[in-house]
Amino acid sequence: MCLVSLSGFCTTQKKYQLKSPDEKLEVNVGIGKNICYSLLHEGNPVIMPSPISMTLADGRVLGKDAKVKRIQRQKIEELIDAPLYKRSQVQNLCNEMILTFKGGFQIYFRAYNEGMAYRFVMTKDKPFEVVNEEATFNLGQERMGYVPFVRGGKGKSMEKQFFNSFENIYTHTQVSEMPSNQIAFTPVVVELDNGKKLCIAESDVNSYPGMFVHAAEGTASLKGVFAPYPKTLKQGGHNNLQMLVTERESYIAKCGGKRSFPWRIAIVSSEDKELLDNDMVYKLAEPSRLEDISWIKPGKVAWEWWNHWGLSGVDFKAGVNNATYKFYIDFAAKHGIEYVILDEGWAVNLKADLFQIIPEIDLEELVGYADSKNVGLILWAGYRAFDRDLEAVCKYYSELGIKGFKVDFMDRDDQPMVDFHYRAAAMAAKYHLMLDFHGSYKPTGLNRTFPNVINFEAVHGLEQLKFASNGKVDQVTYDVTMPFIRMVAGPVDYTQGAMLNSTRKDFRPINEAPMSMGTRCRQLAEYVVFESPLSMLCDSPVHYEREAECTFFITGIPTTWDETVALDGKIGEYIAMARRKGDVWYVGTLSDWKARTLTLDLSFLGEGAWKAEIYKDGVNADRIPADYTRTVIDVPQDRKLFVNMAEGGGCALKIYR
């Protein structure tokens, strides 16, 4: 294949350079007939000269024949408090260059030790419309990438692809072989030379569409794609709970005047494990708008939908009714689980009205019962129903005692839908409600701006195994791929915790009796590996009671952390992650379908005597995935620990003094 280099489209006269604090990363910006940037890491090309611009409806192109008026440089060095994150403080260290242009706009460039970012800023206070944004990532040569194509998007129109749930597995493909008419959501990871990786992401997406990417035909280049602004919508979709776009405008965003635009991010890792522990999306996001966050309580959730309200040995008909939810509340109270969720079914179907409750549910009684047990209730809500009566819903249910909403089926990221996420977050915060966004685009820092947005889906999570076609879904490989890519963007509501575990050959998708792929210990380890401040226990209380030892371990794992250390990992193969809360460490490891032994370096523990409670795959876990052993050992003085994992296996550790 003949590849065309986009660098030929960059005609520059003036050049500006910006280096990272450690000087390993170098950003070069060229200004001439257009504006181009390039990126080097340790002297090696990562992104070749790539044009960037914004085209406005009045015909102006921000970036064409641009003239620099002023250049400003500064070093940013600060610690960001992050009380509901994977570490309690985030270091924000970078060098910044601000180019101010004639015509009323600026471009901010930042060089971090771990990557670079840029954003456009409009300085004129006059309404305008953005027709398109040119965001280019010119790789310069053939590269392999891990690409989350929009599910079902192949051969479809762009419009049909813009309506999607942002849930798919990763395709490992050459960038030049990506169909130019097929889009992928971000983050996307590209393989570089010498084991390095490039991760393309975005942050601070506020009142603007999210960025997809596609391959520029005949090039080794990825280009941004943005959903146009909806012109007309109709109510429909899943149970009449969605707003479907029937026609779009010729522009992607309406803007009121002065504003900043999203950060375009290029993360560079020397080792895969660095992607497991990257903070760029978080630290580039707008700081918190909430002064008081003491009411936001992360934790675990007993969840009924995945296990299909699967109770046995009870004297009532299990389903969407008060008796069933009282059983879940009792289970949560017994095990110190903070919340129980009422998923889809508590409100009258097809009405998109959260004030019409089915007669089998008495919410006031349930809230009182849960409160007496020190358990909070979270309600599922379809997007249209939630947005239509937003303040009335938030006010009423907050006063009733509900702690939050799981809002679902947005399935878009055009500008009005992004606006909804911010509007919902602000209104929920006003009434001290947490939000868990499902059927939503990936996080772009909203959890920093509104910390009450406690989690996001945008993941091919365990729910997919209720319906997956046999042999067509490899969830085990996905589990050791997703954290290097999707989790770079932020927390993930994967909904782990299955107690019915299967081998690859024995897996069956059964809606009312679902199972996981891989071993029991894999499910335990995922509570450590996956960042999830509001973390589901997906299986039935009946199964958890039968597996009391595993349940006790799971319910003791924190959901937010003071420190995170990526110990080891290779994308698509294995992961080892350590996280600390207070003076207790947890370690989780995952493997693909290959049995393997990892040597864990626990030198981060420092001096002193430590014990490790270890849940590891049993000797027969390759045939019986639920087989495991629990041991307690003294951590070796050399701080080296060997971990054996079965095929599709995992290991979970609690390390304490």
What function would you assign to each model-found segment?
Residues 539-586, 590, 622-626:
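Glycan-recognition and catalytic regions of carbohydrate-active enzymes
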Residues 14-282:
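N-terminal accessory beta-strand-rich subdomains and adjacent acidic, glycine-rich linkers
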Residues 1-14:
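Bacterial Sec-dependent N-terminal signal peptides
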Residues 332, 408, 435, 529, ...:
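Conserved, mostly hydrophobic/aromatic
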Residues 632-657:
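C-terminal beta-strand-rich structural cap/linker in extracellular carbohydrate-active enzymes
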Residues 252-331, 335:
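An acidic-aromatic substrate-binding cleft motif
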Residues 343-519:
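Aromatic- and carboxylate-enriched substrate-binding clefts and catalytic-loop regions
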Residues 571-610, 651-652:
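Carbohydrate-binding surface patches
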